[in-house]
Amino acid sequence: MADSVHLNRRGVLFVLSSPSGAGKTTISRMMLEEDKDIALSVSATTRPPRPGEIDGVHYHFVDTDTFKKMAADGAFLEWAHVFGHRYGTPRAPVEELLAAGKDVLFDIDWQGAQQLYQEAGPDVVRVFVLPPTMEELERRLRARGTDSDEVIAARMARAANEISHWDGYDYVLINDHVGECYGEVMAILRAERLKRRRQIGLIGFARDLIRSVPDADTKL
């Protein structure tokens, strides 16, 4: 039996967006636990660390002046001002992962996804996760037991706004069963990894196959 063939490929910038409570965080965690070829993009932020958060693991914590300078220098693939704090995706570590054939997972909203697509185009795959109903979304938010009625109402209003941008994504999934939705997300990732334009070693491999046949009539 011949040895298996491994072709070099370019990584995927995999965006997973959803309203709060629709399952994005759970699915992201499952992806990172099960697939060692994908890494979570660590954002920079000006907000202070929360208890248990580690600099460089959960976020890169920077002051406002540092963040502004990074933005002015083009050091971010995307950034936004959200609830009084700035958040951004550092460019250099993402480009290093891509070049090494690693995939990068982004937990960002529709605005971040739009900016990222404008910057990185063909490398970006955008997936939006919808709840089965708004009633189910509210039930999930209340089941957390962490938010007041006022906060939940604000989250529901924000969710409606986020859902209105569903058509800016390449794939849209309905999460009525988290295991099935996770399977669909992974099917998308596997298919995107196999796209011809990402198989950077494919041209040379095909050329070698053809040249191994004497007198082959080929344009290669």
From Swiss-Prot:
NCBIfam families noted in UniProt: guanyl_kin
Gene3D superfamilies tied to this protein: Guanylate Kinase phosphate binding domain, P-loop containing nucleotide triphosphate hydrolases
Statement: the UniProt record of this protein carries the keyword Hydrolase: no
Protein name stated in the entry: Guanylate kinase
Parts forming coiled coils: none
PANTHER family: GUANYLATE KINASE, GUANYLATE KINASE-RELATED
Gene Ontology molecular functions: ATP binding; guanylate kinase activity
Catalytic function, reaction form: GMP + ATP = GDP + ADP
Compartment(s) where it occurs, according to its Swiss-Prot or TrEMBL record: Cytoplasm
InterPro entries (UniProt xref): GK/Ca_channel_bsu, Guanylate_kin-like_dom, Guanylate_kinase, Guanylate_kinase_CS, P-loop_NTPase
SMART domains, per the entry: GuKc
Protein role: Essential for recycling GMP and indirectly, cGMP.
Kinase found in the keyword field: yes
E.C. no: 2.7.4.8
Keyword annotations: ATP-binding, Cytoplasm, Kinase, Nucleotide-binding, Transferase
Positions with a binding annotation for ATP: S18, P19, S20, G21, A22, G23, K24, T25
Origin: domain of life: Bacteria
Enzyme's top EC category: transferase
Gene Ontology CC: cytosol
Main localisation: cytoplasm
Gene giving rise to this polypeptide: gmk
